Curated annotation (Swiss-Prot):
The lineage of its organism: Eukaryota, Viridiplantae, Streptophyta, Embryophyta, Tracheophyta. The keyword Nucleotide-binding does not apply. It comes from the Eukaryota. This is Cytochrome b6-f complex subunit 4. It is a multi-pass membrane protein.
Length: 159
């Protein structure tokens, strides 16, 4: 009981502060403007100063230095673009590849309208959304793994 600090509601000074709308803080110090205008900027600027100080004192290289005379055989995008890269690489017609990429968000936008009558949050009671998620995850992983392989060994999707 001695660890927790509870305000004495019988204290007339505290009752006067509560009547003025000063909040339930025992000291009567409101959050606005004290915390939001003075303490938060100090914490934010201190965090930024620590990050800048660490970056200046201990800079780390991001990979190895670039050599303009030695380019790789195949330039790969960042990891989150692997499925899109694989679609563009395997589909022979580039317009078809772009249409396939546009169809992914368009298909995801139709899922809420397919299950608008289903109000359950349990994924086992929402078969359409669960199936779309599982199939989309498997296809994205398959395309992502295929993008990391060389062109001659790449997963071609049967096209």
């Amino acid at each position: 009981m001695g660890i927790t600090k509870k305000p004495d509601l019988n204290d007339p000074v505290l009752r006067a502060k509560l009547a003025k709308g000063m909040g339930h803080n025992y000291y009567g110090e409101p959050a606005w403007p004290n915390d939001l205008l003075y303490i938060f900027p100090v914490v934010i600027l201190g965090t930024i100063a620590c990050n800048v100080g660490l970056a200046v004192l201990e800079p780390s290289m991001i990979g190895e230095p670039a050599d303009p005379f030695a380019t790789p055989l195949e330039i790969l995008p960042e990891w989150y673009f692997f499925p899109v890269f694989q679609i563009l690489r395997t589909v022979p017609n580039k317009l078809l590849g772009v249409l396939l990429m546009v169809s992914v968000p368009a298909g995801l936008l139709t899922v809420p309208f397919l299950e608008n009558v289903n109000k359950f949050q349990n994924p086992f009671r929402r078969p359409v959304a669960t199936t779309v998620f599982l199939v989309g995850t498997v296809v994205a992983l398959w395309l992502g793994i295929g993008a990391t392989l060389p062109i001659d060994k790449s997963l071609t999707l049967g096209l």
